[in-house]
């Protein structure tokens, strides 16, 4: 069970809303989000309703302003609690529709291009666990939640291009 609290103002001030489950539309509860406290669980925040727009991965901790979670603005319109997973396995492919070279990963990878020498990553098959895909190396840039399932092309995980720099397992030890 997870618990997250959204605050309208920085520094955990102003109107707040406590949440313990997925919400496809947070707009009725607050107009802006400038700070967040994650008491338990791992969460993906979305800039738009229905789990769309920019995504931000948060684990247990305090985030006194939106820049602390690499947010571009104070807009948080939906959230998803990420289930705990004890094992992680993902296959990454050089081309769309699982074509080209394939590599299977079971651990975090801060620099995919250096490790595997692919110039692009066009499809993924998440066999086990939940992962965060980052646009740039060293877990920077836009973030995308990968749940168990198939991602045949970059549009399937919500990206505008096939730029992938790093990949991290979602693990909650708290």
Swiss-Prot record:
The keyword Cell division does not apply. GO terms for molecular function: structural constituent of eye lens. Detected in the superior olivary complex and fibers of the ventral aoustic stria of the auditory hindbrain. Residues 84-87 are annotated as: Connecting peptide. GO terms for biological process: lens development in camera-type eye; visual perception. Residues 2-40, 41-83, 88-128, 129-171 form the Beta/gamma crystallin 'Greek key' domain. Keywords: Eye lens protein, Repeat. The keyword Cell membrane does not apply. Has a two-domain beta-structure, folded into four very similar Greek key motifs. PANTHER family: BETA/GAMMA CRYSTALLIN, GAMMA-CRYSTALLIN E-RELATED. There are six different gamma crystallins identified in rat lens. Belongs to the beta/gamma-crystallin family. Crystallins are the dominant structural components of the vertebrate eye lens. This is Gamma-crystallin E. The gene is Cryge.
């Amino acid at each position: 069970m997870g618990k997250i609290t959204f605050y309208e103002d920085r520094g955990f001030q102003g109107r707040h809303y406590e949440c313990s489950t997925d919400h496809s539309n947070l707009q009725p509860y607050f107009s802006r989000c400038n700070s967040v406290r994650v008491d338990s669980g791992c969460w993906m925040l979305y800039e738009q309703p229905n789990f769309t727009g920019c995504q931000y991965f948060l684990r247990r901790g305090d985030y006194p302003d939106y820049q602390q979670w690499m947010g571009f603005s104070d807009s948080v319109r939906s959230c998803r609690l990420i289930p705990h997973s004890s094992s992680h396995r993902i296959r990454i492919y050089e081309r769309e529709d699982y074509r080209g070279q394939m590599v299977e990963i079971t651990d975090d990878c801060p620099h995919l291009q250096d490790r595997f020498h692919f110039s692009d990553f066009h499809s993924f098959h998440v066999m086990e666990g939940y992962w965060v895909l980052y646009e740039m190396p060293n877990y920077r840039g836009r973030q995308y939640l990968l749940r168990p399932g198939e991602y045949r092309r970059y549009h399937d995980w919500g990206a505008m291009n096939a730029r992938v720099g790093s990949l991290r397992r979602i693990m909650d030890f708290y």
